[in-house]
Amino acid sequence: LLLEGFKGVKGKVESKPPKHFRTALGQMVNFLYTMQGESAGAQAFSNVDTLLAPFVRYDNLNYKQVKQAIQEFVFNMNVPTRVGFQTPFSNITMDLSVPSYYAKQNVIIGGEIMEETYGEFQTEMDMINKAFFEVMMQGDASGRVFTFPIPTYNITKDFDWNNENFSGLWEMAAKYGIPNFSNFINSDLNPEDARSMCCRLRIDNRELAYRGGGLFGSNPLTGSIGVVTINLPQIAYISKSKEEFYKLLNERMLLAKNSLEIKRKLLEKFTNNNLYPYTKFYLRDIYARFKQYWKNHFSTIGLIGMNEACLNLFNEGIGTENGKKFAVEVMDFMRAKITKFQEETGNNYNLEATPAEGTSYRLAKLDKENHTGIICSNDREYYERGAQPYYSNSTQLPVNYTDDLFEVLDHQDELQTKYTGGTTIHIFAGERISNNETMKNLVRKICTNYKLPYFTFSPTFSICPNHGYVVGEHFTCPECGEDCEVYSRIVGYIRPVQQWNKGKQAEFKTRKTYVVEEKTCKVC
């Protein structure tokens, strides 16, 4: 966008490269609105604060003007403009400080290379980030939280924990749970190697290095053509032994591969036939190099219900020693298969912890109807109270397993690092953290002591039509008795619980929230 503007389709309005801050933000909105019409998943912009900071100085904007522009951008990003009256699913990566790979690059204004380098614009970056923090915390006219864009912050080894300019980040995380944190302290990845496309698709660009060279350090142009989710509980229920389980899993993975290969061919055909005109324009350089538009996009295979697979196969969950051992074995099996698929096809494959906002409920419901006796995550509630069934997400522990956060992190650390496509640990808390220092220390402790790549802090809060933000879960306001909207993270994004599907509502009722205390968050 900064080099070429928003254009590329005959007969449609074209924009030149932006020369001003508000124009750049406006083109980002238009781009995401339009691209949501060509793909079903999320879109993301990386290095947003770094790349936009020079516009602030060139426009000679003060803080009030920057905040007004950011406010317009955020409100526009939360308008339901996609099919089904949904809001475009968007993610942005914010650097906070100028990354080394941009520091000495010349800035782009109006599509032209200027004399200054991005490393000279830290003050303007601070203005953008402060404005973004404040806008996101203030919410809309009724105090509701903004769902999009979901901001991702990279926590690196040289992260400046004592920077006072980041105080708004910790407040935003503690009050609403808005940010996603990407852990690079204990990772062998660097931020320039990875890109967060949606709430969890974390792409290892080193797989692309021999194809794209350094291009992808600054310009991702990558993603996923689609996800096929493997129903592990059903395979386990049908199987009578581990050997049969792996045989069926192998068959399902082959089916997933064939499905994704067919889809890739169809996407190439449709793109060549101008059915994805904007995608065709922005991926044209990829096509010029490989004769394929989607060459740098991954075929993604996901999984769901590892805990219930263990229950159906062994009658013990993933929280046991045997259950976790089996989960690690299955993950290694799937990783090996995906590597083989990649070698056979020449296409990129990855393994993802599928978000499964709807799949966890839909598959469990279908399995309960078609497989008598199959175990779901909330079997007791299903039989005793008629609760809607659901499966646990990917290889995660049951949501009511424990209220000890670090017990969960200890258990999940090895499993989380097995995913090559994306995964997230959500730290569900009953209410906000009142102390920003505690929030900061929690993030620091997790990143320092664990290898898990991606996590959020997700407090429950309520919105009263009269009093706005209310701490914790209150379906009626404790002050005035009005009905409240109760907010929590359904999986990747924050939504009112009342709008969740029945399966996820059943999950919310059984969730144990983690106890986060100041003493447990001290950095060791």
Which sequence ranges carry the predicted segments?
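Intrinsic, low-complexity terminal and presequence regions
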Residues: 460-479, 485-524
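Conserved catalytic cores of very large enzyme subunits
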Residues: 1-295, 316, 320-479, 483-486
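Generic secondary-structure boundary/loop-capping signal
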Residues: 42, 232, 295-300, 491, ...
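Metallocofactor- and cofactor-centric catalytic cores in central/energy metabolism, strongly enriched
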Residues: 66-70, 74, 312, 504, ...
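Extended amphipathic alpha-helical segments enriched in small hydrophobics
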Residues: 297, 303-310
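Sequence-pattern detector for short linear motifs
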Residues: 203-205, 306, 498
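Glycine-centered flexibility sites
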Residues: 302-305, 421, 492, 503
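Glycine-rich phosphate/pyrophosphate-binding loops
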Residues: 312-321, 498-506
